[in-house]
Swiss-Prot record:
Recorded superkingdom: Eukaryota
Alphabetized InterPro entries for the sequence: CSD (IPR011129), CSD_CS (IPR019844), CSP_DNA-bd (IPR002059), NA-bd_OB-fold (IPR012340), Znf_CCHC (IPR001878), Znf_CCHC_sf (IPR036875)
Biased composition, class Gly residues, residue ranges: 80-91
Protein name per UniProt: Glycine-rich protein 2
The species this protein was found in: Nicotiana sylvestris (Wood tobacco)
Pfam (any one): CSD
């Protein structure tokens, strides 16, 4: 192995981690693996080495007596191949790949949000069949609030005169025309005001009226 500084040697990159910023080179002459730091790589761009690539380097002794490779280049001074941003983290298929990440088959966009049976807009999800705002679901749908048989529909609790909850029409302080809140079967209906249809007074129903006949 070339022990003197300034004498170049050849070797193969054993491994290099971009994340850690260092790795090791195996010299061609069979010597011990040499430590190589990111700062010891000659490169105009990102300083990295690819596992298994052939390199040339100088050997330098550090203050602790250990040797390391410096001024590392490709063969005949050419640029190193580098890990191209990969080493240590690999180039795994993340987001967008099959079975992984957002938009991938089986992940994110299929079976997840907006997919069949799940997420927003999917069958059985929010806005879908059986979900909010449609058939059998939340507000505005069949069986939901504001829909057929839901809150405000088919009678329900609350005052049919003013539409407010918490009291009945007979206790309502507001006078008003018929056709109360809600939809099918809602109180109020036609036929004048929201009181007794016998005497026209507010505050009681016809069955409670004390005045004479109709």
């Amino acid at each position: 192995m070339a022990e003197e500084s300034g004498q170049r040697a050849k070797g193969t990159v054993k491994w290099f981690s971009d994340q850690k910023g260092f790795g090791f080179i195996t010299p061609d002459d069979g010597g011990e693996d040499l430590f190589v730091h990111q700062s010891g790589i000659r490169s105009e761009g990102f300083r990295s080495l690819a596992e298994g690539e052939t390199v040339e380097f100088e050997v330098e002794s550090g203050g602790d007596g250990r040797t390391k490779a410096v001024d590392v280049t490709g063969p005949d001074g050419a640029a190193v191949q580098g890990g191209r941003g990969g080493g240590g983290g690999g180039g795994g298929r993340g987001g967008g790949g099959y079975g992984g990440g957002s938009g991938g088959y089986g992940g994110g966009g299929r079976g997840g949000s907006r997919g069949y049976g799940g997420g927003d807009g999917g069958y059985g999800g929010g806005g879908g069949y059986g979900g909010g705002s449609r058939y059998g679901g939340g507000g505005g749908g069949y069986g939901g609030g504001g829909g057929y048989g839901g809150g405000g529909s088919g009678g329900g609790s609350g005052c049919f005169k003013c539409g407010e909850s918490g009291h009945f029409a007979r206790d309502c302080s507001q006078s008003g025309g018929g056709g109360g809140g809600g939809r099918f079967g809602g109180g109020g209906g036609g036929g004048g005001g929201g009181g007794c249809y016998k005497c026209g007074e507010d505050g009681h129903f016809a069955r409670e009226c004390t005045s004479g006949g109709r």
